[in-house]
Amino acid sequence: MGNVPGKIDQEDSFNDVRPDSSYNTTSSNSVIKQYDEEASSRVRTRRTTSLVNNILNGNNARTKTGSHLSSTSRRKTSREKELAKEAHAKQLVVRCSETVDGGFLAPFGCYSFEKLDYDATVVKNLIIKRKLAPFYTPLQDFDESWTRDELIKIVDGLPLHDTFDENLEEFEDVPIGNLRKSTFNELIDKSLSKKEQRRMHAKIFRARLYKKRILWQENENETFLERKLEMKRIGSKSSNVEDNTSSQPRKNYHLPSDDLKYTLYKNGSECPICFLYFPGPFNYSKCCQQPICTECFVQIKRADPHFPHDEVDPTEPQTNDSEKDPNLLTSEPANCPYCATASFSITYQPPTNRETGIGGMPADSYVYKDAAISRADGGQPNISAITSDTIRPDWEIKLNKERARLMRRSANATAIHISNRLIDPSHSRRRNTSHSITPIHDESTSASRSPEPTINELEDQMVREAIRLSLEDQDNRKKSKNRNTSLRP
């Protein structure tokens, strides 16, 4: 029924046909030798195929001690990534209780969520340490003719965060289900292919995360408005700040006093990139001393991993990216958006006339003073340069991951290519056809064929490739471990 006979069966068949065979003794021995070679070839092919599979599977799961990742492990990894994205989104919620010098620790929302891929913890720490300007609530325009009362009234009406578009076309007709449930597998159409189900899962997750961000920010907005109303109701104004006759401690609402509102916006300026009006002081580019708001600064980052842009020689054949060495992948530091100087960095000098919020006095206790407030340490602040790499410390990890991905793809292509050379159906058909017709003629003409690498040579080549990939992977893991150790505080 098409099964390949075993060696014992082969010998029995030879014994049965030998009395009626028309071949001479030399011819019979030649046929037996050919069958033995085919059986040995099948063993080598199975061994080589196993080696190919080991290379293919090993490159995809080298960090695991087992042979391959189970489906449960893959789902767990995917879920961990989703939880990390949710945690990052929560860090971007503007909270009225998290203020520094009249600004906030999270962005107002001038740019889309997808562009806010910086390390939120690093940025918050820089703002708290006053090494980076906080995220201020911007004004669309500013008129110098505004009086104090007019300016305070305008600032008092500013929202905590920019408004969301609740009906994005991207998420139209995408089911989100119950947001309180952690899973949503019941929303996925099981009649779709596995690939389409994964795409649908990713789209539903993005839609759910977008809706969650709206709800999280709306909750903070409600708290913000409630505190405003409560402050007005109890008559907590800047003129009554110095009244300390009551022994009962006053509640901290984390809201700016009228004096702080006026101080913030009366001497603000426009950001040259987004053209919005922000309070000062600004961040300044170290190279050309141009102002830039923090909303715009966190958008600037390194280029995505790519191969060097070599000059194209028309006389030389162009090399495809898939054929290039993955170790050549690079990612240049960001350039200055004003003067295009390489390795863009900014400096920030915090205000000396106000220090409120975290690390300072309560924002609603601030009283305007013409003279600058001297610092407690009596000296100038420690000004340090901040780069895009500072707020995205994982850029090198991402670069190495992309290199490893290209290495795996290249290794897979190499293994498949070698496997195809070892297991060539057309070659087998030609060999079997020639055997069935004239086995002796095949022996006489095989020497005239062009020389090809032997099975053992190809196996040795694959072993060397597997060893090389293993050493590269081990070296990358060692570098990543050392880098993570050095990044720990």
Swiss-Prot record:
One GO location term (cellular component): cytoplasm
Region (Disordered): 1-84, 419-489
Main location: cytoplasm
Biased segments, Polar residues type: 21-32, 51-69
Compartments where found: Cytoplasm
GO BP: cellular response to glucose starvation
Keywords per UniProt: Cytoplasm, Phosphoprotein
Positions bearing Phosphothreonine: T183, T433, T438
Record field: compositional bias (Basic and acidic residues): 461-477
Modified residues (Phosphoserine): S13, S436
InterPro entries listed in its UniProt record: Sip5/DA2
Function: May negatively regulate the SNF1 kinase by promoting the interaction of the REG1/GLC7 phosphatase complex with the kinase. Deletion of SIP5 promotes resistance to artemisinin, which is probably an indirect effect of an action on the electron transport chain.
Further information: Present with 556 molecules/cell in log phase SD medium.
Subunit structure: Interacts with NPA1, SNF1 and REG1.
Family per similarity comment: Belongs to the SIP5 family.
Name of the protein in its database record: Protein SIP5
Organism classification: Eukaryota, Fungi, Dikarya, Ascomycota, Saccharomycotina
Gene: SIP5
